[in-house]
Amino acid sequence: HAPGGGSYYAALWTNDQCEYANPFFPFSGYKAGIDQCINCYSAYENYMDRSDKPMREKRPLVSSVIAEGRSFWNGAGDRGDCEMYAYGLTRFLLEMSDIALIKRFWDDIIWCLDFALSRKNNYGVIESDSDELENRFESGNANLFTSCLTYDVLGNAATLAKVMGDAEHAKLWADERAKLRSSIEEYFGGNVEGFKTYKYYDGNRDLRAWICMPLTVEIFDR
């Protein structure tokens, strides 16, 4: 799932490792892979803007950690990277079911969801500069993928919050999840090429493969 395979990674990505590959490793029992996951999620912590700025003004999470962790790449702007990171991290933690690990990354989950929710537009969906296709195809100011990732993270994180005994965040995230589901339907739902489905972004008139994303997060309304 990355150049170098099981020997090394030439770079870490919020999509390739954080979102896609890492949630698999707890099922594998492959210790090197699980250790890699922890190291990978840890490497991104250096790039979470912990300044005193309002969350809306904070820097997005970088897309890639490169050069053995000494530098980064964010040439496509905010691709929904913190949402990708948190999607993979919360699933990884649920699968590991390790209280110490949940505590270890708890502040990162809070940061990511605070950031994501600060990017809600007036229609209640999550804005980002692009998606992992990095503007190879148009994605508008808010795309279906980023909002669906956020929806999934909110549910996963609410479950983890209950494990942590954090009733405040459990309720907040469950409530935000319900609101986001409604917003996804209202903003993205539509008729595309004769199908009652989803527009990938506002104004999208073509069927796109990623309009299946709601199905992957158990939204079966269309």
Predicted region positions:
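Intrinsically disordered, low-complexity regions of eukaryotic proteins
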Residues: C18, L133-R136
